[in-house]
């Protein structure tokens, strides 16, 4: 059976043709793309295929190899394009070797920023004949050698900022005859070599953020005659005589050429002031200015720029007090009279510099232009670096800030000095939020409305000097959280309220000199890191340490000169605080004005105890040697001064003689003091010991002299009358037969002791016999003695006579029964019979009485007196009229060694061993050989003068 195919319809045929056409189109597109890619790779090179994206625009290829981790240039190959920009920033290149760019002849811009390049070897840029811009910013370069940039003869733009460059060799830019823009900001340059720019046609130079203090005219500035933009900010400029040439040169170039300010860092009297505000007399007050001035120059011109005469943006400066005493209001600025003012036009880069071809890199330094609106009465210029507008309205007789029309757009700096402004209102700066500097000096401002600066959050410098402000309050500075420099000198300020500076925590410089301040509130500087404070020329008599001076922990310089300081107790704490400041911190000496004795005297030179004689105690902690360093902004150790409730010192400890003492001297001094103390202590110890020994020796010798002054000898003979010489210290062996007794005078008048003139002590041997003798010995209640008087003896019957073994002379007869009476009455003398001083019954000792030598002292005769009756003369000792007037009896008791001393008859008896009694009977036991000699001396009477001399001698003793 035959089956035929179904007929093909028109619709199906159309569908097939469309499908086939789509396949062909897709195949063609793929083929074209492949061919195109192959052609691109073949045209741009491998760098655009594998490593980096490439983009061609306006006949220029941009090769973006940024942040690819490239360590060496061997990892990439040069693109195959006539002109290209090679961007290699953000990689890891550390060194550039010779001839590494020899095949990159088409490069016109080379970005090598943000790598870690430390060295560029000679010939590294060979082959870059067409390079016009080179970026080496944010690397680690330290040196630019003479041959660093060899091969870059056509270079126009060089950026090497944010490195560590401290040295530039003199010919480093000598071959760069086309260089116009040089950016060297934020390095470590402290100076530039002479003739560095001699063959370089620079028009833009950025030297911000280095360590430059001077820029000489000869050899440097004289070769920069084509500069149209210069940036010198953030350098520690030394505003001295050497900077006069820079000031003259800046005045000779275009007013708009200087971008930013040249702010003085030193000296302190000019710190924080712009160079164009400082007169030459202030820069060089003691030398001839003409020696430092720049030589006259012809007006300079720069292609493509309209030049105007420099407008002086002067602010009346505080004159140096070292030359003359400044008036109440400072003089006007030193702007040259009749100097024409020409309003400068905004600067636009000329086309012949080729900036339009620099691409995005030119935006690194400049931005798109902004509308320029300037008040009619002022002159303005645009600061290209930050597109800030500088508005100069100096000396325009402006009475109100509201008169400035039209309002300037985004002003960065406004100079309104030398006008007639009296009030600053809240609405005056509503549209100036980006303001960095506001100069209102030398007006007539007497009132500033609360929060008038509330919208100026970016303001860093505020000049209110030379006005009529009388009071400062916290509301005045509200909103100025970024303020760093505040100038309030030459006003009428009498009062500063507590917390005035709380809204300005970043304040570093405060000038309050030449006002009428008498006191500062407690805590006025709390929370601040002030580096420089000027209080010169006020009415301070003292400043408390607590709450004021102790909060100034970061000071670099402070000026307290020209105040009527009252050098009394109130300034003791301040003086001690000043003495602990480091050298150079205090500007000029603090001079006393009162009291009169200290007038015109340096406070440091006066000892603290002289300032405050009636001091109590002031405790000051001495700074450690590390505090000699320049204070930082962190809180350092502050002097601890103990003060009273008023904040003034309570008194004084020890005055310090110097503001600082080297550590070595301090250690040596302490060592010497320690050694001296040891020697002094040893000497005192030896002296005390010698005195103690001497006292003991004197006491012993005195006792010996008291005993030996009675030349008495005692002898005890054994049985049978055996002889032996007696001795005062001889021991008694046994009792023998009675020996003959001899009554003798004292032998010589000097052997008696006169009556004492007074009591020496309570010791009985030094007590007088006047008055009740028994009462004189009441302290000796523990001793037992007995006494009896002559009257008692006379009432007793005489004993029977006893025949002695040897017949003595009549004067030497012993009374019968004497031994028995001695047993009962213990040593009775004609005047008194004093018993032996015996110990207590419970402390009996077989040792004989040690005080036996004090008994038996001579007794005055009752019938012969040498002193007339009724005479006022002192009673002198009595002497016997004849030897026969004496009756002898033994006045001591001899006992065997084994016998004990017996107690006395009662406690009421006299208990006194007589020492200072008048001469009386002396009972001795002479030996046989001395008997005749002793007998011969019985008839000797002493001379009266000898007696008187002896009494005087003992009175002195």
UniProtKB/Swiss-Prot annotation:
Side Cytoplasmic, residues: 686-957
Glycosylation-annotated residues: 103, 644
Record InterPro entries: Cys-rich_flank_reg_C (IPR000483), Leu-rich_rpt (IPR001611), Leu-rich_rpt_typical-subtyp (IPR003591), LRR_dom_sf (IPR032675)
Lineage: Eukaryota, Metazoa, Chordata, Craniata, Vertebrata
Main location: membrane
LRR repeat segments: 82-103, 106-127, 130-151, 154-175, 178-199, 201-222, 410-431, 434-455, 458-479, 482-503, 506-527, 529-550
Transmembrane segments: 665-685
Disulfide bond entries: none
SUPFAM superfamilies membership: L domain-like
Record-annotated LRRCT domain positions: 235-286, 563-614
Name this polypeptide is given: SLIT and NTRK-like protein 5
Domain of life: Eukaryota
Tissue expression summary: In the adult, significant expression is detected only in the brain. In the embryo, expressed in the subventricular zone, cortical plate, pyramidal layer of hippocampus, thalamus and hypothalamus.
Domain called LRRNT: residue spans: 365-407
Species annotation: Mus musculus (Mouse)
């Amino acid at each position: 059976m035959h089956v035929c195919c179904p007929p093909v319809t028109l619709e199906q045929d159309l569908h097939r043709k469309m499908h086939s056409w789509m396949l062909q189109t897709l195949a063609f597109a793929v083929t074209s793309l492949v061919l195109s890619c192959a052609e691109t790779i073949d045209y741009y090179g491998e760098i655009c295929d594998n490593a980096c994206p490439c983009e061609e625009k306006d006949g220029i290829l941009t090769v973006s190899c940024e942040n690819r981790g490239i360590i060496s240039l061997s990892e990439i190959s040069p693109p195959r394009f006539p002109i290209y920009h090679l961007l290699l920033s953000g990689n890891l290149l550390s060194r550039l070797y010779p001839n590494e760019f020899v095949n990159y002849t088409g490069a016109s811009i080379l970005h090598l920023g943000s790598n870690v390049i430390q060295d560029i070897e000679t010939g590294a840029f060979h082959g870059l004949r067409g390079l016009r811009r080179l970026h080496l910013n944010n690397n680690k370069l330290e040196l630019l050698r003479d041959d660093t940039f060899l091969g870059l003869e056509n270079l126009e733009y060089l950026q090497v900022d944010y490195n560590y460059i401290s040295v530039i060799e003199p010919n480093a830019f000598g071959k760069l005859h086309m260089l116009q823009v040089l950016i060297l900001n934020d390095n470590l340059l402290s100076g530039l070599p002479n003739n560095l720019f001699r063959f370089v046609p620079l028009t833009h130079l950025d030297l911000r953020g280095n360590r430059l203090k001077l820029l000489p005219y000869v050899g440097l500035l004289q070769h920069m005659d084509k500069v149209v933009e210069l940036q010198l900010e953030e350098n520690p400029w030394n505003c001295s005589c050497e900077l006069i040439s820079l000031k003259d040169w800046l005045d000779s170039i275009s007013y708009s050429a200087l971008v930013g300010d040249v702010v003085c860092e030193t000296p302190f009297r000019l710190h924080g002031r712009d160079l164009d505000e400082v007169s030459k007399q202030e820069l060089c007050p003691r030398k001839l200015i003409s020696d430092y001035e720049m030589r006259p120059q012809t007006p300079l011109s720069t292609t493509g720029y309209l030049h105007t005469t420099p407008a002086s943006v002067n602010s009346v400066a505080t004159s140096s007090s070292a030359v003359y005493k400044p008036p109440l209001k400072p003089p006007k600025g030193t702007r040259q009279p009749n100097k024409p003012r020409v309003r400068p036009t905004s600067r636009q880069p000329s086309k012949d510099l080729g900036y339009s071809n620099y691409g995005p890199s030119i935006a690194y330094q400049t931005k798109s232009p902004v509308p320029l609106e300037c008040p009619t009465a002022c002159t303005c210029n645009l600061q290209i670096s930050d597109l800030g507008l500088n508005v100069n309205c100096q000396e325009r007789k402006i009475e109100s800030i509201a008169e400035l029309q039209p309002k300037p757009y985004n002003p960065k700096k406004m100079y309104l000095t030398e006008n007639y402004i009296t009030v600053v209102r809240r609405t005056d700066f509503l549209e100036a939020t980006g303001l960095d500097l506001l100069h209102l000096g030398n007006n007539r401002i007497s009132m500033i409305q609360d929060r008038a600066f509330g919208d100026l959050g970016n303001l860093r410098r505020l000049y209110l000097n030379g006005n009529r402000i009388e009071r400062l309050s916290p509301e005045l500075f509200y909103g100025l959280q970024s303020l760093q420099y505040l100038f309030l000198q030459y006003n009428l300020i009498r009062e500063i309220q507590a917390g005035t500076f709380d809204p300005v925590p970043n304040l570093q410089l405060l000038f309050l000199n030449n006002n009428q301040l008498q006191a500062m509130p407690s805590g006025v500087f709390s929370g601040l890191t002030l580096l420089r404070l000027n209080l010169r020329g006020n009415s301070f008599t003292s400043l408390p340490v607590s709450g004021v001076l102790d909060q100034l922990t970061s000071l670099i310089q402070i000026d307290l000169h020209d105040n009527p300081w009252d050098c009394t107790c109130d300034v003791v704490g301040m003086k001690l605080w000043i003495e602990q400041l480091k050298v150079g911190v205090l500007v000029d000496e603090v001079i006393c004005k009162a009291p009169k004795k200290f007038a015109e005297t340096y406070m440091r030179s006066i000892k603290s105890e002289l300032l405050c004689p009636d001091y109590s105690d002031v405790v000051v902690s001495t700074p450690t040697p590390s505090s000699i360093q320049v204070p930082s902004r962190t809180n350092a150790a502050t002097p601890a001064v103990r003060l009273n409730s008023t904040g003034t010192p309570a008194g004084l400890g020890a005055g310090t003689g110097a503001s600082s003492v080297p550590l070595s001297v301090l250690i040596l001094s302490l060592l010497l003091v320690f050694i001296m103390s040891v020697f002094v202590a040893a000497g005192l110890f030896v002296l005390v010991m010698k005195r103690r020994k001497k006292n003991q020796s004197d006491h012993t010798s005195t006792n010996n002299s008291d005993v030996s002054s009675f030349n008495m000898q005692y002898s005890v003979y054994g049985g049978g009358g055996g002889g032996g010489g007696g001795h005062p210290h001889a021991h008694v062996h046994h009792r023998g037969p009675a020996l003959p007794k001899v009554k003798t005078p004292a032998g010589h008048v000097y052997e008696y002791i006169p009556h004492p003139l007074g009591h020496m002590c309570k010791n009985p041997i030094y007590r007088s016999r006047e008055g009740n003798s028994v009462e004189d010995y009441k302290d000796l209640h523990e001793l037992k003695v007995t006494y009896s008087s002559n009257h008692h003896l006379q009432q007793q019957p005489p004993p029977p006579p006893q025949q002695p073994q040897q017949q003595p002379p009549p004067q030497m007869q012993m009374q019968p029964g004497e031994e028995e009476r001695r047993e009962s009455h213990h040593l009775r003398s004609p005047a008194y019979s004093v018993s032996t001083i015996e110990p207590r019954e419970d402390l009996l000792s077989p040792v004989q009485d040690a005080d036996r030598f004090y008994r038996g002292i001579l007794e005055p005769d009752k019938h012969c007196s040498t002193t007339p009756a009724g005479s006022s003369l002192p009673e002198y000792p009595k002497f016997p009229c004849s030897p026969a007037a004496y009756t002898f009896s033994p006045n001591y008791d001899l006992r065997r060694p084994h016998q004990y001393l017996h107690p006395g008859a009662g406690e009421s008896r006299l208990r006194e061993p007589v020492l200072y009694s008048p001469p009386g009977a002396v009972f001795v036991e002479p030996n046989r050989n001395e008997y005749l000699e002793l007998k011969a001396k019985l008839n000797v009477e002493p001379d009266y003068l000898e007696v008187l001399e002896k009494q005087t001698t003992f009175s002195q003793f």
